[in-house]
From Swiss-Prot:
Natural source organism: Nocardioides sp. (strain ATCC BAA-499 / JS614)
Gene this protein is translated from: rplQ
Name the record gives this protein: Large ribosomal subunit protein bL17
Family (UniProt): Belongs to the bacterial ribosomal protein bL17 family.
PROSITE patterns: RIBOSOMAL_L17
Record-annotated disulphide pairs: none
Length: 202
């Protein structure tokens, strides 16, 4: 069951509203932009965008459907040959409404409705790609840090236990031993890295 739109009609009767929207759409496609009241611009926007979508299909049936609304054949030709190809990649949003100051005579709110001329640039979903990249490096960096902390605590605990039991002269000797132990552990590590580089070359 057809139901009327909410709010007052443009012009009073349904036929007058259809004529107003038809004339506004014709002028919009002919000139590219028109200045009218905000309420007329808001009513024209979905009407004009449906006509552009039909023009994008470009077949005979849709041309006849557009000719029911826009009676000027030269404007329909312009719509199908010039305007519709510019919106081929754009999925919708062919028009833009910009509010301007009120009209001087009766203070009616005015607006400019125009066809969008900028090239369509689809936005890429950047948030989904950035999140996995940020989480991947984090575990790799934490693992070596925990190993070095564990080695340092083991080295620090060993001298403190020896100093409690030994005399001050012996503590000097025990402090030198961990340094020698660290040097001894570094030499095998260096040898293992040399062996791994030789294996990589082979």
């Amino acid at each position: 069951m057809p139901k009327p739109t909410k709010g007052p009609r443009l012009g009073g009767s349904p036929s007058h509203q259809r004529l107003i929207l038809s004339n506004l759409a014709t002028q919009l496609f002919e000139h590219g932009r028109i200045t009218t009241t905000e309420s007329r611009a808001r009513a024209l926007r979905p009407h004009a965008e449906k006509l552009i979508t039909k023009a994008k299909k470009g077949d005979l049936h849709n041309r006849r459907e557009v000719l029911k609304t826009i009676r000027d054949k030269s404007v329909v030709h312009t719509l199908f040959t010039e305007i519709a190809p510019t919106f081929a990649e754009r999925p919708g949003g062919y028009t833009r409404i910009t509010k301007i100051g009120p009209r001087k005579g009766d203070n009616a709110p005015m607006a400019v409705i125009e066809l969008v001329t900028e090239a369509y640039k689809p936005s890429a979903p950047k948030a989904k790609k950035a999140a996995p990249a940020a989480t991947a490096p984090a575990p790799v960096e934490e693992a070596p840090a925990e190993e070095t902390v564990a080695e340092e605590t083991a080295v620090e605990e060993a001298p403190t236990e020896l100093t409690d039991e030994a005399s001050p002269e012996e503590s000097v000797v025990t402090e030198e031993q961990p340094v020698e132990d660290e040097a001894a552990t570094e030499e095998p590590a260096a040898e293992s890295t040399e062996e791994s580089t030789e294996d990589d070359k082979a």
